[in-house]
């Protein structure tokens, strides 16, 4: 078992005592850092960066060299799984991700393979192993996947969407086809996350970026049900240590109670949910991660510190809080402001852990 020098992130997820509130940032390895842009240019394009274990490791470690973060997160993309299913992922300038062969019907679903994580997704596992080696036990490594619903939105829409009419048409006109797709994705994601854990990920997170576009009933049936299946199938212990699982549904603040029933260890909150309210509702069951508005990092340092203080006070004394943004950091945020944020979390949270 690798001895971790700093395990406060894992301890907080398990609601165990910590000295200060741990902090990391969604998309902490990314375009707001000048050094990331240099490595990205070296790789040529985004997927080449993901598929090169050494370069993926380099960008994973870059934010840790700048800031005293309490966790590293694997540099990858949620669309690696659909890509490995053969949908032909490519990136359109200004348009984001696209697929050459979107899923349109049950026959398309039946043809999709369940990818072997050590074969078609072997490059991700190589990156995990490389990052773990290079971290030298400094902080834990987080692995992740998109949720079945969120992955399905890209696969059926053929890329990003604003209104989600194509997948909602399938959901209401041909629910069987969508359930078949979600079931296949749940199996694929379970294998994928378990392979990341075996390769060295010490915690995992499921990103349900688009769960919030659903009605409550549809969220239960088409998103949460399949995340629950994944949580049930995950390795919860590895290398003599519990492997915590965090679920994050953007726009899912009204469903925290149902999410907490899945058996996950923590829930990610976006910035539209009040953390004090969330703790009252589910804090006796799960840890909470979040939840500063990423746009707050455009504010002057004093305002960033004030917001950090407000969120810490909202959560209050005791254990079970991992500080983060409510979604990914924006690409044009000044890197110094991210530094102010991280430093403020550690300095201002000490009083809540005495």
From Swiss-Prot:
Q: Which InterPro entries does the record cross-reference, listed alphabetically?
A: UROD/MetE-like_sf, Uroporphyrinogen_deCO2ase_HemE, Uroporphyrinogen_deCOase
**Keywords from the named record:** Cytoplasm, Decarboxylase, Lyase, Porphyrin biosynthesis
**Site, as annotated: Transition state stabilizer:** 77
- Reactions mediated catalytically: uroporphyrinogen III + 4 H(+) = coproporphyrinogen III + 4 CO2
| Enzyme Commission number | 4.1.1.37
List locations, semicolon-separated: Cytoplasm
How does it associate, per the subunit comment? Homodimer.
Outline what the protein does: Catalyzes the decarboxylation of four acetate groups of uroporphyrinogen-III to yield coproporphyrinogen-III.
Q: What is this protein called?
A: Uroporphyrinogen decarboxylase
């Amino acid at each position: 078992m690798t001895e971790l020098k700093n395990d406060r992130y894992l301890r907080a997820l398990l609601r165990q005592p910590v000295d200060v509130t741990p902090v990391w940032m969604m998309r902490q390895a990314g375009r707001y850092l000048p050094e990331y842009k240099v490595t990205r240019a070296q790789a040529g394009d985004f997927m080449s960066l993901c598929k090169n274990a050494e370069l993926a490791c380099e960008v994973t470690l870059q934010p840790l060299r700048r800031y005293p973060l309490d966790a590293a997160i694997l540099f990858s993309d949620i669309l690696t799984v659909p890509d490995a299913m053969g949908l032909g992922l490519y990136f359109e300038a200004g348009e984001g991700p696209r697929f050459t062969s979107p899923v349109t019907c049950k026959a398309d679903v039946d043809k999709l393979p369940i990818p072997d994580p050590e074969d078609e997704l072997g490059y991700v596992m190589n990156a995990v192993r490389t990052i773990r080696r290079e971290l030298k036990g400094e902080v834990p490594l987080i692995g992740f996947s998109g949720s079945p619903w969120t992955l399905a939105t890209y696969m059926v829409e053929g890329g990003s969407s604003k209104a989600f009419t194509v997948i909602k048409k399938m959901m209401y006109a041909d629910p069987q086809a969508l359930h078949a797709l979600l079931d296949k994705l749940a199996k694929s994601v379970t294998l994928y996350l378990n392979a990341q854990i075996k390769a060295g990920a010490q915690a995992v997170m499921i990103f349900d970026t688009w769960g919030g576009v659903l009605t409550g009933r549809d969220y239960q049936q088409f998103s949460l049900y399949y995340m629950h299946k994944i949580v049930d199938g995950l390795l919860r212990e590895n290398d003599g240590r519990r492997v915590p699982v965090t679920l994050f549904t953007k726009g899912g603040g009204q469903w925290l109670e149902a999410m907490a029933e899945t058996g996950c260890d923590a829930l990610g909150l976006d910035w539209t949910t009040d953390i004090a309210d969330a703790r009252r509702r589910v804090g006796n069951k799960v840890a909470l991660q979040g939840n500063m508005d990423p746009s707050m990092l455009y504010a002057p340092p004093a305002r960033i510190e004030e917001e950090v203080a407000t969120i810490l006070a909202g959560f209050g004394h005791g254990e079970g809080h991992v500080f983060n943004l409510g979604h990914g950091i924006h690409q044009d945020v000044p890197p110094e402001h991210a530094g102010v944020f991280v430093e403020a979390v550690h300095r201002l949270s000490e009083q809540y852990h005495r």
